Amino acid sequence: MKFIIRTILIALFLIAIINESQCRRDPRKFRLSRVFEKLIEKNSRHHENERENEIGRAFDMDCVKNFFKLPQNGKMILKETEEMVFMVASGMKCSTEYKIFGAMFRDFVNEGLKEHLTCLKWQLKQYEPSAKLIENFEITEAELKVCQEKFPIYNEMKGFQKDLEDLLGPLNTYTCGAVSEDGAKDFLIFVSKGAIVEYGDISEELKKTEKEKLKDYFKDISIKTAECHIKRFENEPQAYQVNDTLNYYYKKDLVPTDPDQEDPNGYYQRLIKVEEAIDKDCVKQKLTLPENGDKAFVEPEATILIASAKTKCIKIDQLEFSNLFIDFALEDGQRHDRYYSCARYKLHQLDPNSQLAVITSSDKSHEKHCRHIEIRLHPFSIPINGYAESVGKLNEATCGVLTDDIVNVVTLKTMLLYDVKDKELKINETKELYGLVTDKLQKLARLILERVR
């Protein structure tokens, strides 16, 4: 039950692209980003990289330009959530194999829905009694009672939709007609049909036909939403420009306004401290940030500029850097010894002379397993992945400023700092890490500004 509700909520976010869309502007919307972040974090993490890779492969910039008339001069810079709209839309419109649909579909329709097929069919019958997927469907009184008492998905979705509309206005207006007014019903039908198609006892021919209809539905929503962004940019370009990029992303989006909001590990309080320490005049002077404010940066670029300002202008001490930086390491690294073993093993390959990379027989025993583990650096992974998806592979896009090897080394050393018992070694490694990151951030920030000019 909880899985189905969570799945529908995630579907609502991904398809309607409500958060940070520019089809309606409401300053209160920024609180939603944290709601969706938590929803997505609870989703199965092992599908995340696979889905991102398929989105990246499906994203054809030339196709986007041809179909949606993206400005050729490159002055239109989209926020990360808006890029997702175009990636989905281009994947659906340009790719004949609909890889993007397959990736999303697997997120919405899961084996966990198998045991609820009877109730899903019953729900579908309420809205589409003549649907071919439920021909000859019958339900016993006992089954009906269970569905009525324990399966009120629509009502719960309706309540969630009302909360959204209180903040955003009617969903169909907010998304320029891409989603109907009764979003709760639409997404319940989508998930119900998807589960019946995937797990129901129906003919292969009917299964294929109905899945194509679901693809068309998903494609239609994606393309309409992307076209809405293009039209809005052409008619109201100021809606996509930010006078103060730093404040826009960090004060309005990431820093909580509700004092009672959950703050795991004091993350937001540290973020506020970082924000307060940033010297904007220093950013303009050292990095020649455009003073007229008419240049908008995508969120990953803003992140890099902020980090660069922090390291260059404020002269933070090593301990503060360590506390801020290490907090972002992969959470599993704190809980599983196997990650330490894999980290040591991989770091030994990249940097055999590192004192942190003295591998043991236990580490060697994990060799095969380690090859399948991707250890990512969280504070870099979001800006780097988003930036790379937009402009090409990282080492090409940044002229070699940051390479995969550098990211891996920084990742591994950061994670290993949890495990190091030798205080002197820990201090030395932290200093080395701090110097490496500072240098790379400065170079990358300058390169971004040069690209904007």
Swiss-Prot record:
InterPro entries: DUF5442. The keyword Nucleus does not apply. Pfam families: DUF5442 (PF17514). The keyword Secreted applies. GO terms for cellular component: extracellular region. It is found in: Secreted. This is Balbiani ring A 67 kDa protein. It comes from Chironomus thummi thummi (Midge).
